[in-house]
Regions:
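Post-signal peptide N-terminal segment of secreted/secretory-pathway proteins
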Residues: 63-132
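Coil residues (strongly favoring Ser/Thr
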Residues: 59, 82-83, 95, 147, ...
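N-terminal mature-domain "stem" immediately C-terminal to a signal peptide or N-terminal signal-anchor/transmembrane
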Residues: 20-87
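Surface-exposed patches in mature extracellular/periplasmic domains of secreted proteins
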Residues: 133-140
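Bacterial Sec-dependent N-terminal signal peptides
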Residues: 1-32
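Terminal targeting/pro-maturation regions of precursor/exported proteins
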Residues: 46-47, 125, 185
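Residue-level detector of conserved catalytic or cofactor/ligand-binding positions
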Residues: 181-189
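Hydrophobic alpha-helical segments and helix pairs
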Residues: 145-182
Length: 189
């Protein structure tokens, strides 16, 4: 009889666990929070310091954003090319891009406000469209090529396209009317 009761308790426990029924003790999973990976800082660490650990993270941990940046956004080659990381380093060593990277780091020391906005937006979206998957969000510097990258479950934000309409480098590459759309990322539209 004790064996049956023990088995019954184990089966009921397994049933509750597999069905996700909460016991009310705070074991339920928190809603998914968005945290923006500072891919731009990781890439800059590689470019400026020739950091092997940063290169490993780019190629192993963040393979997809690296492939998208190199092949689609910058179009400087393929990730399979043996010299692609030297080419990437040379590309971002251009004096204009060095200034751009420095300005982006000064303007966006952290992305707390962006993360708050993304979390608020995705909470609203999930209410309207249940089952919506939250993408992996990262920041990058696209050399003025793209504003937003959206591929599968990735969302890339090119911070260099959100420096504010009066940003001096925009004047060199864009017409005045184009600069109007290059607002600071935390400004309301």
């Amino acid at each position: 009889m004790k064996l049956r009761i023990s088995l019954l308790v184990i089966l009921i426990s397994m049933l509750f666990a597999s069905c996700g029924i909460s016991t009310g003790k705070g074991t339920e999973q928190k809603e998914e929070e968005i945290s923006v990976l500072r891919y731009d800082k990781l890439l800059n660490e590689y470019v400026r310091s020739n950091s092997f650990s940063a290169m490993q993270k780019l190629t192993m941990d963040y393979r997809q954003p690296t492939k998208i940046l190199i092949e689609d956004v910058l179009a400087i080659g393929t990730v399979k090319d043996d010299t692609i990381f030297q080419r990437l380093q040379k590309f971002y060593s251009d004096t204009t891009l060095v200034r751009l990277v420095s300005d982006v780091e000064a303007k966006f020391p952290n992305l707390d406000e962006v993360e708050k906005g993304l979390n608020k937006g995705f909470r609203k979206l999930k209410k309207e469209v249940p089952g919506t998957k939250v993408p992996f969000v990262y920041s990058q510097i696209s050399a003025f090529n793209e504003s937003i990258i959206l591929v599968d479950t990735l969302l890339g934000i090119s911070l260099d396209k959100y420096m504010g309409e009066d940003y001096p480098l925009y004047k060199r590459f864009y017409y005045d009317y184009q600069c109007l759309s290059l607002i600071h990322i935390s400004e309301p539209t």
